[in-house]
């Protein structure tokens, strides 16, 4: 049977990502932490660590080329996805992980400590109440809300020319039809996942 490490290495190759051995180890340790805490905290419906490699790690890392440093916010981070895998792979970028569920932010804070991630801040807050000291160059979300809500809830967090990235499964045609802003749909191919994945990208211009 394939190991988590083998699946991760193959997936990283397919995504064209080159990570150090310590970074790969951190990613696998993150899966172990989710597995350990999942019983008590109900962090994810995925129970199999091997499935987590594709559905959580590789799915998160598929958007890495589209993330604009240096300040990134992960809205509705849940179990720390996609924020923690990306933070492991982008150590020079600062990540702020936000969720309104205190159980989940407790887990994410613990994961940050155990994985020794110095570039991650965890906030227990509703998105609309967030007042960051510095605006973000990228705001991203995964399975958070419909596109209109995401846009309305996060625009105040974006710096001029900052980008909003919304991770979706099938292209949400109806949601996109209701938007009064320009957007780009980026198809994603995630190793180990047959289902469709896409990324919706929007940019905040100086007048928007």
What are these regions (language model features)?
Residues 151-161:
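A short glycine-rich, Lys/Arg-flanked "PGG" loop and its adjoining helix->strand segment in the class I
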Residues 1-69, 73, 103-106, 110-120:
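Class I SAM-dependent transferase core
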Residues 161-171:
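Conserved beta-strand signature within the Rossmann-like core of class I S-adenosyl-L-methionine
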Residues 58-141, 151:
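Conserved SAM/SAH cofactor-binding pocket of Class I
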Residues 34, 86, 168, 202:
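Residue-level signal for inorganic ion chemistry
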Residues 104-106, 147, 172:
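Short alpha-helix immediately C-terminal to the canonical SAM-binding loop
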